[in-house]
Amino acid sequence: FINVAGLAIGLAVCMLISLWVFDELGYDRFHQNYRRVFRVYWDESSTEPGSASALTPPPLAAAPKKDFPEVLRSTRFGTWQKRLVSVGDTNITETKYMHADPDFLTMFSFPFVKGDPASALSNPYSVVLTEATAEKYFGREDPMGKTLNVDHAFDVVVTGVLRNVPAGSSLEFDLLSPFEILLKEYIGEKNRDNWGFNSFSTFVMLPEAGAGPGLGRKLADYIKAIEPQETDTLALQPLSAIHLRSRLSHDYNNRGDIKYVWIFGALAVFSVKTAALRKIS
């Protein structure tokens, strides 16, 4: 009986660890285009060996799409500060109010409940909400076309509702508005073409996963051409590598580590083997 119980416990431990391992390995793979989406980052190893940063400047997203035909879509993604969002008597400080370009919703597969991903961010003063956020502000009412006030400064119109962002997503947000709002209301037009203002993520989508290394080399040459004094260079990181294999500074808070996946995976195998040997003996 003891041996059987030991085997059952070993199998249970293995199953629990396996569920966690598969969750970690599955991060960002719910996106239909995850193999073709890459994050552009700064490789700073020329000034500090092994150093790299996830933050890039505002003009970067437009440059590859304009100058490199292999870039099908591109987007910036980020925020600037907490936002006070209001409707009626409801005032809530939002910490996950993010901004992106219109391509974002067709590059990434965040499922829509209402609205059209191809046009939801085309109006500069629009906002897309998750289901939980829509219910928080509007209850059971249809939020489409309704208005939210931001920081007592400007209004945004609800143009889409998404299912809540999956737990296995590196990119997290509750509200999403066009990047243009950041330029117009917060960081200023002066930073639209400021290559030294490294504050946001940049993503590109390519025709195929294998096109990444070639574009990475082109981007390195490109930055040297427009900023001859720049010693750092641009590089690409696959979307699927962000959660477990990223060592960039200024990265997302929900990052994991492939090392622990291997350790716990080995522990799961060991627990089953140990329990099985005890059962046999």
Write out the residue ranges for each language-model feature:
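N-terminal signal-anchor/signal peptide hydrophobic helix marking the start
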Residues: 1-12, 262
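Intracellular coupling helices
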Residues: 1-2, 6, 275-281
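Hydrophobic alpha-helical transmembrane segments of multipass integral membrane proteins
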Residues: 7, 11-14, 269-276
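Sec-dependent signal peptide cleavage junction
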Residues: 25-39, 45-55, 61-63, 164, ...
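Mid-to-C-terminal secondary-structure elements
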Residues: 98-114, 126-256
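N-terminal membrane-entry
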Residues: 251-269
